[in-house]
């Protein structure tokens, strides 16, 4: 697959870091996660990014996060040069979904306001970015749970290989108090610190003058695999790209490090696989977990 270059990055996530591309616009918002049981994204002043006050007022929180990230990531690039907008989400616009369902119950299925339903659809964010800049290019949204972002990234890389010059790809998910309570009752958050966030990347065919990074390859696989099978697939992936395990300087994983005496068995097994890979496959690499910064959510890998 042809190498792809990351030209700009925009991110809204917990701990007050809002990095936008090569010229970051940092918002010194206070950490809003202190009084919540999950990591909440610290949001910028949207007036500086989404100029239309009427449009901004109608947007839900996650829509504003995603649209702001997308617009900042585009920067000064002309809309005509965008070959596609590809977004990913695991659960979509939860606040609007909850609002619509509550109205459905409160009003006994009569005289419903359609706006929350319209805003709750998964493709809202990609569509809003396209409408704001009148981008008539390819527009796709992936809702593949934990593989949503990887699916969007793969699609973007394939579009560039087919001839597109620039692709805007992003991922976003939000956590609400209702969603947190439901997931907690279902036992999905044992030993896990929940989070949320929105990220966008401007990918291009050409390296340009100051690319942030180069993506040489991507591989995903699902299902139940032993540590040996996973190790074998990683080794083959590296070899296809002309690398060996000892060449890897940084190993960034999705290991959850929150300790719990009643931790989920599946999460313990997953963490044990990460630890075996760190010990046996990449012992000389620097080991990091991105979930320490953003928490756990379907598109946290972005």
Placement of each model-derived feature along the sequence:
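Short aromatic-hydrophobic micro-motifs that form the base-stacking/packing surface
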Residues: 168
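Conserved "HGTGT" condensation-loop signature of ketosynthase/thiolase-family condensing enzymes
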Residues: 1-138, 143-150, 158-164, 172-302
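Internal active-site segments that recognize and position negatively charged phosphoryl groups
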Residues: 155
């Amino acid at each position: 697959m042809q190498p792809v270059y990351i030209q700009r990055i925009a991110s809204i996530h917990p701990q007050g870091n809002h990095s936008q591309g090569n010229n970051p616009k940092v918002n010194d918002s206070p950490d809003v996660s202190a009084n919540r049981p999950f990591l909440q994204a610290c949001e910028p002043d949207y007036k500086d990014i989404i100029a239309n006050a009427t449009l901004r007022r109608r947007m839900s929180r996650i829509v504003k996060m995603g649209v702001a990230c997308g617009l900042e990531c585009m920067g000064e690039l002309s809309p005509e040069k965008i070959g596609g907008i590809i977004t990913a989400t695991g659960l979509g616009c939860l606040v609007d979904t909850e609002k619509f369902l509550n109205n459905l119950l409160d009003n006994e299925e009569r005289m419903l306001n359609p706006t929350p339903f319209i805003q709750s659809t998964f493709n809202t964010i990609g569509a809003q970015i396209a409408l704001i800049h009148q981008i008539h290019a390819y527009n796709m949204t992936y809702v593949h749970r934990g593989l949503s972002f990887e699916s969007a990234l793969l699609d973007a890389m394939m579009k560039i290989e087919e001839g597109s010059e620039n692709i805007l790809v992003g991922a976003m998910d939000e956590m609400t108090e209702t969603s947190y309570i439901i997931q907690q009752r279902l036992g999905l958050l044992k030993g896990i610190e929940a989070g949320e966030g929105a990220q966008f990347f401007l990918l291009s065919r050409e390296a340009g003058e100051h690319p942030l990074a180069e993506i040489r390859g991507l591989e995903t696989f699902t299902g139940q695999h032993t540590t040996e099978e996973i190790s074998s697939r990683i080794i083959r992936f590296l070899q296809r790209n002309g690398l060996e395990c000892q060449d890897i300087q940084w190993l960034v994983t999705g290991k959850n490090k929150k300790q719990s005496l009643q931790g989920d068995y599946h999460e313990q097994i997953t963490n044990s696989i990460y630890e075996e890979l760190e010990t046996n496959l990449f012992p000389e690499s620097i080991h990091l977990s991105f979930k320490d910064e953003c928490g756990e959510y379907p598109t946290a890998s972005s």
